[in-house]
């Protein structure tokens, strides 16, 4: 059975454009893409609707900390969050912030983050997530580029904002702490002409009276900054329509294939709210009246928070699921021969039934009770639905968790530019394992051939760049019409990811077209920019950096500067020739340490550091098809040529970390 339908024929190649395959939709949208209900104009209506239905339902929860001990979760109701958002929006208006102005939100996941976002929704103010994982100067860049005039900031991020103020105080005029503010901080900001408030102080500036401004689908809901190919963040413009369509499409797909969220559900929030993935999930929770419980923001206590909250919905990235898989696998493997055999029998029995089409809950109830329920308890005991996104989930990990977690697991694919998920696997369709599924009900997808990489969208096994069209797409990059024109062509967004259609209509991610890739934790790596920094190390002549999207770190093939390496060897009384030196582990460690020293000097982030290198004595050349006539690296060919070395680097680096 195919889960997609063809709605447009393939496009042949022309002198200016490569060929493109047919256009497909999900079978659940065969009669047309999902349309927003008439009159729906803003995501604010999702919160106000839930308040009307169930004002006293718990909405946002966090653990109270007393004497360094975490207590139970304490909750704000839907009515309380609604009223606090109105007060905060009223206070913003009193400070001269008007509809269409920009409001920054800077901090880890917590109720105040969502209240600030909802305050923006209520008065048609554009919210701009601020976060520093895009680089050391990213917050300052986003404030200036996004023209942020007010910012809600977590207490422990106040100092970071203050360090930016000398270069952005002409724009940023108001800072509101998620909690308290010190007198010293107030004086420091006032000296620069900026007002600083505690959360309580600012709340008291607002009130619940007054009419809300008119809102429109075309309003810019958020400017969400994402990694740029050169390291400079790009501001992705997402409208109210895109956000709402994504949320309703999520509901649509869950209704058709599994079970929608409800007021009985509890979501565990720990993935960064500054990213589109978690924002969409939390917006969907609000639309359905579900509860959202926040972690403490400390990875050491994540499992403790999970056990206390006992959520029903869990979202993760491949790196998280890989760790969960490794933990389960280790426990089973160390449990003795008999226990291991019984577990494997239960696993095989349940998997066989799931392959026959039985949903996970009906595949092996007895085996669940005897073996797999203990794994479910690790998530708190109530998990019914898990999502994976941000990078491809390894096939073996997805299969293992589908069988053992006693929960439905759905893997999706999306980008900031597609407002989160644009393709999703159907949780109870076992053959979709290893794929990112079918288009959401707001999206059409096609593949475009990439001849230079050998990918043909018209072949028997269609492969090419994934292109998207639909209502959840972004409107462009803020102040970067040039970049917008590069990726939005004739209404089609060119993702830069290479996909392969499967016989059942699901999409599999197989490669990356652009010289920027994603690691397993979801971080983007602008590889050319990073290689340029590493090339400033005087010990190397050439470098090819590689990151497998199933791994969380980078490795590299390096051509050392011959004289520099030989001088290093002579100073240590090593008499090896150059080729032998390149095979010497001490030389590899020396080069690796010097490269990472260069990286630190230029403030590369932790995941941009190298964990292992292979020293290549021969320069990259055209004879081996490793470079172009203009000396540009041919990355697919480099990966093919050095694949065995790359696999060994990853294997050895992971062994060294254990």
Curated annotation (Swiss-Prot):
It comes from the Eukaryota. Its main location: cytoplasm. GO terms for molecular function: ATP binding; CoA-ligase activity; long-chain fatty acid-CoA ligase activity. Transmembrane segments: none annotated. Pfam families: AMP-binding. Its EC number is 6.2.1.-. CDD domains: LC-FACS_euk (cd05927). It is found in: Cytoplasm, Cytosol. Residues 298-411 are annotated as: SBD1. GO terms for biological process: cutin biosynthetic process; wax biosynthetic process. The keyword Nucleotide-binding applies. The keyword Ribonucleoprotein does not apply. Residues 412-477 are annotated as: SBD2. It is an enzyme of class 6 (ligase). InterPro entries: AMP-dep_synth/lig_dom, ANL_N_sf, LC-FACS_euk. Keywords: ATP-binding, Cytoplasm, Ligase, Nucleotide-binding. GO terms for cellular component: cytosol; endoplasmic reticulum; membrane. ATP binds at residues 226-234, 411-416, 497, 509-512, 632. Belongs to the ATP-dependent AMP-binding enzyme family. PANTHER family: LONG CHAIN ACYL-COA SYNTHETASE 2, LONG-CHAIN-FATTY-ACID--COA LIGASE. Both substrate-binding domains (SBD1 and SBD2) are involved in the substrate recognition, and are sufficient to confer the substrate specificity. This is Probable CoA ligase CCL6. It comes from Humulus lupulus (European hop). The gene is CCL6.
